[in-house]
Structures are given as C-alpha cells and as structure tokens.
C-alpha cells in the first residue's frame, strides 16, 4: 500500500517538474524574441508643408502700380519685373533721354555748360512744370540742365532740345535714333523732349523695361548725372532762381519714404501716365535702378519704390 502511494507521488512530482520545465522554456524563448527583434519606428505624419521654406527676404513685395521693374545697375540684370513689357506713357521720365543727349553733346564738344541759350517763344510758352523765364531771356546750358533734372522744368527741356538740334522736332528724331542704339524695344516712341502730351493727343510711350534700360545707360555712360539728381535744391545763376527736387525720397526726415543711398533719378506725371518714378540708390557696392509706372498718387510712387529698393538690397546685400 505504501509503495503504491509513493509511486503516485513520484509520478505527480515528475509531472509538476515537466510542467515547470516547459514554462521556463517558453519564457526564455519569449525574452529572446524581444531582444533580437529590430526596433520599429513609427513614421511621422505628413505636415503638408514644402521641404524648403522660402525666407521672407526672397518674397517680392506687392506693388500697386501699372508696371514695375528692378535691375542691377552694375550689369543690367533684372531682379524683379511686373507687366514690364506694356507700353505706357512715362511722362517726364522721358526727360532722361533729353539729359542723355545733352550730356552726349557736351562730351562730344558740340555743346558746353556755359553756352548761352536764348529762350524761344515756344519754349517760354510750354505748359506744366516750368521755371520763370520769358521769351528772349538767356540762360546757360548748365542752368537749364539743373532745372530739367531737379525741378523737371518742361520749358527747360524744350530750350535744351532747340539748342542741341536747332528744333525740338529734330531733337525728337535724335531721341528715337538713340533709343534704337541703346536697344530699347520697338514700343519706345518719343514724341517730344518734355514728356507732355501733344495737342493732337500723341505722347511718348515706353515700357518699364525700356525706362530701366534708359536709366541704366544714363548712369553707366554719364555717372555725373547723379551729382545733380541727388540735390534737393539748387540755385540757378539766372535771376538766382531756386529749383527744388520733385524726388521726395531725398528728404532724410521723411522716414516713410527715405532709403539709404538714394540719389536719383526722375519723376513723372501726366493725367494719362499717372504718377511715375525712376529711382536709383547705392548701398555698399550695390546699386539698383527701379521703375514704377501708373501709380495712383504722388506719394504712392515713392512708397512703392521704397518697397522695391528694400527688397532688392535684401537680396544683394
């Protein structure tokens, strides 16, 4: 009886030991699997954003103008452009071509700064911006040139045109010939020396790209132009007449408009052209030329120019 009891106990012990052995084998196998399995990293959710985020300084500003352009004055390369190939009226910005031909004539020795210019009836009667001079008055080329580029005097433009080419009509022919030589577009057509609308309704037309190219060549070929266009005021020898710049960006006290390095170049306005401005400024080794055409107010042409110049210098500097 005792042998039977001990036999049963022995069998029960063997069964328990077997169960324990299988249990520990399973645990060890499970631990081994955990240690050897590669780590699975969950993929991050997509954000929908581009991998490359454009820095704010590379985002061009919104410009409220019919047309606009920025070029690098060192090489003529375009930095920004909008509607730059539409031919529109440039108003007095066309006087940059008048100044170009005057400076060319001076460099060629055909005209001199102290040449006396007798004012014709046509010149004296020219409308719009003008200096106080009458028919038969005599002014020097230098005085007329300062009045042209600082105060945008239309009567000075006509007087200079007549002095260089005998008549304004002849001068306009020179303007259009020079436009071709400078490789301005076929859309560039000069109607007179001042930028005013003619009695028959015709007027000068240029694209913003044409205006920028003209300014580029004017500064490149005759950098002395900036010695005049950076002036806020100047006194003429003729009757001590004071001329005041139409470029309000030259005023350092006007924080909303002024930008460091501004030294030109030419404003423009007629009813058909709207308010226009070709500006240039230099910061460090970088000079830019900007053009805005067809803005809605006198101040707007300068605020939009400030935006363009700030953007350009952020890129270049």
What are these regions (language model features)?
Residues 12-16, 268:
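Hydrophobic alpha-helical membrane-embedded or membrane-associated segments
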Residues 3, 30-209, 219:
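Active-site-adjacent loops and short helices of periplasmic peptidoglycan-processing enzymes
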Residues 9, 18-26, 105:
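Hydrophobic membrane-targeting alpha-helices
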Residues 1-13:
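N-terminal Sec-pathway targeting helices
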Residues 22-33, 313:
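Hydrophobic single-pass membrane-insertion segments
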Residues 33-35, 53-56, 61-65, 167-317:
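Penicillin-recognizing serine hydrolase domain
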